[in-house]
Amino acid sequence: MRKLIFIAFMVMSVCGYAQKYEVGTTTAVWKAPAAANFLHAKATGVKYVEVAFNQCYRGVPVDEVIPRIKEMKAKIDSADIEVWSIHLPFSRTLDISVLDDRLRKENVDFMAEMIELCAMFQPTCLVLHPSSEPIADSIRAQRIANASES
């Protein structure tokens, strides 16, 4: 009987707790997100989305990044989905911990511009990678210091 009561308590606890979460997804599930994707997501119960800025950055000419971000915003708005978070762009080269000070400054400046653009989405949080891996043990401490300083 004690086991049955314990199991019932656990099920009720989990079910009650699970009800606190809303359904969300990420733009990264679609290779090239279209407005129809967001409308379908909304119709199936998705309330929140994380915007993957890499979709607007990777392999894209620099002058097309901002227009693509604005286009992504319009598509999300058309479905009335709330942006929960923005996953800022990252790569082995777009890294705020690199040892080359000139390149690090360029990366930080670019990232600052991306963070400013996030304001139009009104996200709850941002995801920023402080570095990329792998990092050799011999330079790890300096890379951590650079990421912190950036």
Predicted regions and their residues:
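Active-site acidic/histidine proton-transfer and metal-coordination neighborhood
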Residues: A35-N37, D77-A79, L94-S150
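N-terminal small/glycine-rich loop or linker at the start of catalytic domains
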Residues: A18-E22, W84-I96, S131-P134
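Boundary/entry segment of secreted carbohydrate-active catalytic domains
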Residues: Q19-A36
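N-terminal substrate-binding region of glycoside hydrolase catalytic domains
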Residues: G24-T26, H40-P67, S91
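Acidic (Asp/Glu)-rich catalytic clusters
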Residues: Q19, N37-V46, D63-I86, A112-Q122, ...
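Sec-dependent N-terminal signal peptides
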Residues: K3-V14
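Glycine-rich, proline-tolerant flexible connector loops at the mouths of alpha/beta enzymes
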Residues: A52-D77, P130-A136
